[in-house]
Amino acid sequence: MRLDKARNMYKNIAGTFISLFKSRSEALTSARDADPRTFVESYFYPLLGVFAITLFVGRLIHLGTFDVAELLRYSLAKLSALILSYYLISLSFRYLFEKYFNKSFTIAKMQIYVGYILSVDIVVGMLIEFSFPEFLEALSLYIIVLLWEGSRSFLQLEEEKRLANTLMAIFVFFGIKWFVSFFFNKLIL
């Protein structure tokens, strides 16, 4: 019974992730109406769990030796940076969208928006961790497309405000991710 439930959950995660590429407008529109608790429990946190396992195993493959302290330090630094980025980006987006675009969202709704966009970065990170070519990191640029589409589908901004919103969101998203990753790399790794 539990195995079937887990299998269905991960099948739904894969389907949701694929829909971000296949029909991003529909995916982001449905994300607007999603229940925040369901999103976190059945999509984002399980995806983080898979990411943590991938970091651990990927680092084990790269090291070639089983050094638990090094594996945990690396995995926890990367995972902590991702989670902190998730919350900081959500808070920043909520504040900036309310202040500059008169769009008020709860933190939970903004976490859904950021979570869907960040899931692309998570999957790219998993692929790179397993020695796929580093050029796959360019897939992270798809986040720009999602931010552009999200300004229409999720945030429902007027056409003339979309470009300003997207540029600000790109700067905030990548800036926070870079700063947090830099901080954790210097602090822990």
Residue ranges and their predicted role:
Residues 127-189:
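Terminal transmembrane helical module of multi-pass membrane proteins
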Residues 2-105:
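Selected alpha-helical membrane-embedding segments in polytopic membrane proteins
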Residues 81, 85, 108-147:
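Alpha-helical transmembrane segments of helical membrane proteins, especially in multi-pass transport
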Residues 37-51, 113-117, 121, 163-170:
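Alpha-helical membrane-anchoring segments
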Residues 30-37, 113-116, 129, 157:
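Membrane-interface junctions
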Residues 53, 89-94, 120, 144-148, ...:
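Alpha-helical transmembrane segments of polytopic integral membrane proteins
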